[in-house]
Design a protein with these regions (language model features):
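Class I (Rossmann-like) S-adenosyl-L-methionine-dependent methyltransferase catalytic domain
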Residues: 2-128, 169-233
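Alpha-helical scaffold elements within enzyme catalytic domains, especially in hydrolases
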Residues: 157-160, 205-206
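Short glycine-dipeptide loop
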Residues: 162-168
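A short, conserved alpha-helix within the catalytic core of class I
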Residues: 145-157
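Hydrophobic adenine-recognition pocket in adenosine-nucleotide-binding enzymes
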Residues: 142
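A conserved beta-strand element that flanks and buttresses the S-adenosyl-L-methionine
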Residues: 138
Length: 233
């Protein structure tokens, strides 16, 4: 759950509890606060509403404002093209492929992304259930959002999509906000995104729990991101 959104939503209804009984007014307040569009307000509990808002915030940011910076990463950027191809993979999954920059460069690649039309499949990772498993995966900034239970569930599902011996490449965020210093005040579209605070201990503990080998962990060359590589058993 995105606690930044939850706390703001709680603040809104604490100040104006009538919003809980006025769905249209609540919808307008949410749209104005989070700069998103909601067709209707239907939820059984506050956590469900928070998840809907969070998904809309991510959709708005990655569809309309996010810019790729693949060339700026020493380890988790374009270097991966040769590294992945050297594995001779039968199938490769790019999780959260964005503009699908590796398409046509990495062999046998399938790109999934819920927010970008360039993807082969417009689907979230947890909703991706292919008929065949993968020999390699890329998750270069896509498993970065939400609480620990969500991040771990995505890691667990990614591992489940892999054949034995598959190599999994990751770039993760240690909890730093995206730099939008060039935008006017009030137009920082990543304000409401919760960036998960990855660290080496979490990576090691997850690897142990998911029964995968760690091949590499290092800090990449741009924005303090962490690059790591797993291999399934």
């Amino acid at each position: 759950m995105n606690h930044k959104i939850l706390n703001k939503l709680e603040q809104l209804v604490h100040i104006s509890p009538q919003l809980l009984r006025q769905p249209n007014t609540l919808r307008h307040a949410i749209q104005s606060t989070f700069d998103i569009e909601l067709d209707e307000i239907e939820y059984s509990h506050m956590g469900e509403l928070v998840d809907r808002i969070d998904d809309k915030v991510l959709d708005n940011y990655f569809r309309n404002h996010w810019q790729a910076e693949m060339k700026k990463y020493k380890y988790s950027g374009l270097k991966l093209i040769d590294e992945v191809n050297s594995l001779n993979p039968r199938r490769v999954l790019d999780i959260g492929c964005g503009y699908h920059e590796f398409k046509g460069k990495i062999d046998n690649l399938v790109g999934i992304d819920p927010y970008n039309d360039a993807a082969d499949l417009r689907v979230k990772l947890l909703d991706h259930h292919p008929d065949e498993k993968y020999d390699a995966t890329l998750a270069l900034g896509s498993i970065n959002f939400g609480s620990t239970d969500k991040v771990f569930a995505e890691l667990e599902h990614a591992v489940s999509l892999c054949n034995t011996g598959a190599v999994m490449f990751f770039r993760v965020n240690p909890g730093l906000p995206h730099d939008e210093s060039d935008r006017p005040v009030g137009k920082n579209h990543s304000n409401w995104i919760y960036f998960y605070p990855w660290d080496a201990n979490f990576i090691v503990n997850c690897a142990e729990q998911l029964n995968v080998d760690i091949l590499d962990i290092k800090t990449d060359s741009h924005r303090g991101r962490i690059y790591f590589v797993w291999r399934t058993k």
